[in-house]
Amino acid sequence: MEMEVKTALDKFYEVFDNPKKDDVFFDYEGLRYQLSCCGYIFTERTEDCEDEQEYGFDEHGKELAEAVLNSKVNQTRDKTIREILSELPPEAIWLG
């Protein structure tokens, strides 16, 4: 049984679960947001630059998606991406 898509957050998860990922765009309070499907995070030890790790949506997608959704990147920093997407209807986001 498919989950009913009621909010933009529901649509985000629907897009994220699709094997062919796209960037997700939405507008909110005068800002355009782009959540990149090809985002990467690199880490390494600061003292010796060893033990480099690469995290990308292909292998660590759920973990990175949750970090993105929990970030506060709007100008007033009063809402997380998750909170914003929860307020918007599904048709407010588009793929690119």
What are these regions (language model features)?
Residues 1-27:
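Negatively charged, low-complexity tracts enriched in Asp/Glu with abundant Ser/Thr
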Residues 7, 43-46, 76, 80:
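Residue-identity detector for threonine
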Residues 8-12, 16, 35, 64-68, ...:
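Extended hydrophobic/Leu-rich segments
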Residues 18-49:
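Amphipathic, interaction-prone secondary-structure segments
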Residues 56-96:
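Mixed-charge, Lys/Arg-enriched low-complexity segments
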